[in-house]
């Protein structure tokens, strides 16, 4: 599957640019034939990834950029969100935020860390590389039957 189109954007790591990426993704996904529900899932996952970069990658006095890439294939989209800011320990975040139990009162739920779990739940495949900043690669298939062929859920490279 080497024949694909690629769209790349570079935006300042500021909250007001999250919507620019969402609008671009929405247009691309609609053109590809994704359902309304899948487009909403894609927009939420991308918003979470970019918001994480905006909030955590760069210090307050440091300006940074976020690279966003869309690999457009016949049957799926691959999305890359990358920054060159500070990295994080994925296993530590997982331990601090989960697991959650249905009987736990909402008031006692820990804050933060939901973004990565939400991305994982909404996308068909998620890979995180946090060696030089953070790069999140995620993909979603147009037809849900395709997921079974490539259902390797989440992996990390540290």
From Swiss-Prot:
Family: Belongs to the anti-sigma-factor family.
A family per Pfam: HATPase_c_2
EC number: 2.7.11.1
InterPro entries: Anti-sigma-factor_SerPK, HATPase_C_sf, RsbW
Protein source organism: Oceanobacillus iheyensis (strain DSM 14371 / CIP 107618 / JCM 11309 / KCTC 3954 / HTE831)
Role played: Negative regulator of sigma-B activity. Phosphorylates and inactivates its specific antagonist protein, RsbV. Upon phosphorylation of RsbV, RsbW is released and binds to sigma-B, thereby blocking its ability to form an RNA polymerase holoenzyme (E-sigma-B).
Enzyme class: transferase
GO molecular function annotations of the record: ATP binding; protein serine kinase activity; protein serine/threonine kinase activity; sigma factor antagonist activity
Ranges that cross the membrane: none
Protein name from the UniProt record: Serine-protein kinase RsbW
Gene from which the chain derives: rsbW
Taxonomic path: Bacteria, Bacillati, Bacillota, Bacilli, Bacillales
Keyword Kinase part of the UniProt annotation: yes
Keywords noted in UniProt: ATP-binding, Kinase, Nucleotide-binding, Serine/threonine-protein kinase, Transferase
Reaction catalysis annotation: L-seryl-[protein] + ATP = O-phospho-L-seryl-[protein] + ADP + H(+); L-threonyl-[protein] + ATP = O-phospho-L-threonyl-[protein] + ADP + H(+)
């Amino acid at each position: 599957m080497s024949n694909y189109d690629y769209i790349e954007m570079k935006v300042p790591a500021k909250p007001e640019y999250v919507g620019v990426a969402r609008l671009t993704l929405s247009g691309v996904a609609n053109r590809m034939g994704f359902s309304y529900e899948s487009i909403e899932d894609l927009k939420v996952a991308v918003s979470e990834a970019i918001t994480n970069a905006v909030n955590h990658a760069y210090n307050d006095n440091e300006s940074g950029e976020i690279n966003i890439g869309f690999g457009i294939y016949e049957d799926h989209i691959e999305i890359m969100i990358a920054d060159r800011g500070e990295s994080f320990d994925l296993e530590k975040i997982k331990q601090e935020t989960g697991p959650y139990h249905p009987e736990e009162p909402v008031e006692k739920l820990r804050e933060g860390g939901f973004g990565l779990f939400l991305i994982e739940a909404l996308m068909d495949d998620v890979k995180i590389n946090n060696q030089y900043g953070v790069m999140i690669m995620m993909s979603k298939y147009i037809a849900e039957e395709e997921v079974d062929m490539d259902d390797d859920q989440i992996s990390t490279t540290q």
